Design a protein with these regions (language model features):
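Charge-rich, low-complexity N-terminal segments
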Residues: 1-120
Length: 120
């Protein structure tokens, strides 16, 4: 049996989008309450009954959240233009080697705007 496991995380951060068009509201300093969904997919282990241990996903994501929470995202290497697309790809790059079966990162910047990233 195959299954997908998703774990949700949140962080608060400020940002500017320096490459947004002149006059765009996101060029100025602003912040979001971000929600991140990390999904792994694979075969369910017949012994444990799970695809992957939730705690291991949390352990991989926790140091990243510590770096991002209440930060100015533009100051973080790789997030100089921190669009939700770039944030999703950044998480993927950091987690791919730590989370076997990583299949999707979703970054929500508002309740109605999100980016779904499934690797390059």
């Amino acid at each position: 049996m195959r299954a997908r496991l998703t774990k949700d995380f949140t962080f608060e951060a400020a940002q500017t989008l320096p490459n947004a068009p002149e006059g765009h509201k996101c060029r100025g300093m602003h912040g979001h309450s971000f929600k991140i969904e990390v999904s792994v997919e694979g075969d369910v282990d017949p012994k444990t009954g799970w695809v992957y241990d939730h705690a291991e996903i949390g352990a991989a994501v926790k140091p990243l959240l510590k770096m991002l929470d209440h930060s100015y995202l533009n100051d973080i290497e790789g997030l100089e233009n921190p669009t939700i697309e770039e944030i999703a790809a950044w998480f993927w790059g950091k987690l791919q080697s730590q989370c076997p079966g990583l299949c999707e990162i979703v970054v929500h910047e508002t309740p109605t705007a999100r980016c779904v990233y499934r690797g390059e």
